[in-house]
Design a protein with these regions (language model features):
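Extracytoplasmic gating/loop element in the C-terminal half of outer-membrane beta-barrel translocons
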Residues: 87, 99-102, 231, 285-286, ...
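Extracellular/periplasmic, surface-exposed regions of secreted and cell-surface proteins
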Residues: 86, 106-109, 144-145, 150-156, ...
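Conserved C-terminal beta-signal and adjacent last beta-strands/turns
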Residues: 114, 556, 645-673, 693
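Non-catalytic regulatory/gating segments with a bias toward low-complexity or hydrophobic composition
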Residues: 12-13, 33-35
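Residues embedded in well-ordered regular secondary structure
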Residues: 1, 31-32, 39-139, 176-180, ...
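Short acidic/polar hinge/loop motifs at secondary-structure boundaries
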Residues: 1-17
Length: 693
């Protein structure tokens, strides 16, 4: 979506639940966003030009302390050059450093031109757009250029329609800021010692007469986060992406009768990307894999998708009954091919010359990653209506996914059924209720497991430069993941201007494929199991109001609330070990985390539960103990201590839109209520003594 020119979009609609899954497959099990792009209009040629400029600055920053200077334990002895636990600063020693000053004013320039023309039989649309952005972090750039063409033609008394389109996108970026510590200049900016002069490091490189090159100036040291001069990261740790993408589409539809239509569509989406990473000499050796000469990496991933479908659409009335039927078949083929080369620049190489010939022959790594997935499908949906007040909806889809090759289940079927009734059309309601509909549905959606689990594959060992077979235990009977969902809902319109929607849902997911880290002999290192049972249950509420005064001023407001409760009903229970025949039971699974904070799945818990196995040492009264040296004492390898769940209790949103004589003003407020947040940024700031807390 981010690659699409906003001026090319005609409308955006959202499909949810079974309707999305029936048309677009298991990838749309949670819904689908359908974007309709513009087409040419009948009439005189129209040319539209638009231009806008956005400015950005950091809005909310962490709270920093500027009372204590460089050092540790209240002293400045020169041994702790990157900590701010030093002596109290005074007017003479206070530098007045403000991290906000590191950031630039970000600017984004967007310019576009569109052309529309057409006759009753042929319509043409063309657009060109450019987005040029300079980020708030120094030396961060993003550019995108879009070119779009679409032509629609009618034949045979408008019964036959041909629609063709083409888009070409050029995108390049430099130093997009990522999360983590090593390649993120914000880390040393936030943790910079408060007793040092930040202005001195703005000249981030100095001439090294011995090496005859400029090297990084960073007297503060790397610390345990491998920090570098933030300006060196911005200007001498370069990461660039250059992407070219083209999309071609064609559709042909024919109206056999006024109630029967057939159509066929094909879409091709290809992208070619070139990624480069250049780390200059004297960069942190953790990043350069030990080289003081620098590091170079290049990768060229190519991605392609071909989608095609045929559809038959029926829309007919039979007296009091209406029938809408869609029957079709589709195929989608995804391919990925990446060739990459990386390594440190050799000791006798030329510093800061970035090409594959200058890499260390003993450490350079060449890789190629290639895969293909294909899914063939047939699907159908039918909606039977009675007197425009009662509707029965049925959908069904069967997928043959390549991930299921060599398994006992080579395809999977997922159906749905829904019933809705417009009560306001059936009985007379109080005058305050303009519209009332109740609805209920059930759907069962399948999802294929990861590719190559059931097909023999080999992986390349970069260390030994040999091919090795995958070492997971031979898999027998694997089945697709399955989610069964129930939903009940109510939609109302009150007092002409109010809208109310309420939904309750229950979703059970099982047959999940994962590696529970159980012991396997016979030379295998892992075994994949299909088990698990996770439940999601919740409610969604929406309330809206819209009114127009004197045909000029309109106010529209919408409030939404959602609450979801996630619960792990079962992890691994009575799974028979294929070697020993013994039952396997697991009610705890560590799925990773950051530092001492770990996401641990437990029966009865949720997927967002966060635990720790470290705590501060406390006395018999529960008070935190302090060592004779004045340091906190930590105790590791404790039983799981639950910190909480990262899932919120509910999500809230409130939007307002005001319009008056062509002027529009809008505002959106969102909130997450409940749930915990683990901030590695806050933890690092506390450790280095720069946070206000």
């Amino acid at each position: 979506i981010a690659d699409i020119n906003p001026d090319d979009i005609e409308s955006i609609s959202v499909l949810t639940g079974a309707a999305a899954a029936a048309l677009y497959g298991s990838n749309a099990a949670n819904g689908a966003i359908v974007i309709n792009t513009k087409r040419g209009k009948v009439g005189k040629m129209q040319v539209s030009v638009s231009s806008n400029t956005d400015f950005s600055k950091p809005f909310v920053m962490p709270r920093f302390q500027n009372r204590y200077g460089t050092g540790s334990k209240g002293k400045s002895d020169g041994s702790s050059t990157n900590l701010s636990w030093g002596p109290l600063l005074n007017d003479a020693s206070r530098r007045g450093y403000e991290p906000r000053d590191f950031f630039d004013t970000g600017m984004t320039y967007t310019n576009s031109v569109t052309l529309s023309t057409g006759t009753e039989k042929n319509q043409t649309f063309f657009s060109a757009a450019a987005v040029n952005s300079e980020g708030i972090v120094p030396n961060n750039r993003y550019n995108r250029f879009n070119f779009t063409f679409r032509n629609t033609t009618s034949f045979l008394n408008d019964k036959l329609k041909l629609d063709i389109g083409a888009s070409y996108i050029i995108q390049n970026d430099r130093n997009m800021t990522n999360q983590g510590a090593y390649s993120n200049p914000i880390v040393p900016v936030y943790l910079f010692p408060r007793g040092d002069d930040f202005n001195l490091i703005k000249v981030f490189e100095r001439w090294d007469p011995a090496r005859k090159i400029k090297t990084m100036y960073w007297p503060q040291g790397e610390g345990d986060l491998r920090m570098q001069n933030p300006y060196w990261i911005a200007y001498r740790n370069l990461r660039t992406n250059n992407k070219k993408r083209y999309m071609l589409s064609a559709s042909l539809s024919y109206d056999i009768t006024d109630w029967l239509n057939v159509s066929g569509r094909v879409r091709v989406d290809n992208s070619n990307t070139k990624y480069e990473q250049k780390l200059y000499a004297s960069s942190n050796t953790t990043l350069t894999e030990g080289s003081t000469q620098g590091f170079y990496a290049i990768a060229k991933p190519d991605e392609s998708q071909v989608y095609a479908d045929v559809l038959a659409n029926i829309n007919k009335r039979f007296g009091d009954y209406s029938l809408v039927v869609n029957v079709g078949a589709s195929i989608v083929d995804n391919k990925y091919d990446e060739l990459s080369y990386r390594g440190p620049i050799r000791a006798n190489g030329i510093p800061n010359v970035f090409n594959v010939f200058d890499l260390d022959n003993t450490q350079k790594k060449a890789r190629q990653d290639e895969w293909e997935e294909q899914t063939q499908s047939i699907f159908a949906s039918a909606e039977l209506g009675w007197k425009s007040m009662l509707y029965l909806t049925l959908t069904g889809r069967n997928d043959w996914a390549s991930q299921l090759a060599n398994s006992s289940s080579t395809c999977f079927f997922y159906p749905s059924v829904g019933l809705s009734a417009i009560i306001s059309e059936m009985v007379k309601l109080p005058s305050a209720i303009d519209y009332l509909k109740i609805r209920g549905s059930f759907s069962s959606v399948g999802m294929p497991y990861p590719r190559n689990l059931t097909s023999p594959t080999f992986e390349y060992d970069e260390t030994t430069q040999t091919w090795k077979p995958k070492t997971h235990y031979p898999i027998g009977d694997l089945k697709p993941e399955r989610t069964n969902s129930w939903e009940l809902g109510l939609d109302m319109r009150l007092f002409k201007d109010f809208n109310l929607g309420v939904s309750w849902y229950l979703a059970n997911t099982f047959n999940q494929t994962f590696d529970p880290k159980i012991s396997v002999s016979s030379g295998y290192t892992t075994i994949y199991l299909q088990t698990g049972y996770v439940r999601n249950q919740g409610v969604e509420l929406s309330l809206g109001y819209g009114h127009t005064w004197k045909k000029d001023f309109r106010w529209q407001t919408n409030f939404t609330l959602s609450h979801n409760k996630n619960k792990i009903i079962e992890l691994v229970k009575d799974y028979i070990h294929p070697e020993t025949g013994e039952p396997i039971n697991k009610d705890r699974l560590d799925v990773g985390g950051l530092g001492k904070a770990r996401f641990i799945l437990k029966t009865g818990g949720s997927l967002g539960d966060l635990y720790t196995q470290a705590d501060l040492k406390r006395d018999d009264n529960g008070m935190v103990e302090i060592s004779p040296a004045g340091a906190l004492i930590t105790v590791n390898n404790q039983p799981d201590i639950k910190l909480g769940s990262v899932f919120p209790k509910c999500n809230l949103a409130w939007s307002n839109q005001f319009s008056w004589k062509g002027f529009n003003v809008s505002a959106l407020l969102t909130a997450r209520i409940g749930g915990i947040v683990y901030s590695a940024t806050a933890a690092a700031m506390d450790q280095y003594g720069v946070s206000e807390s």
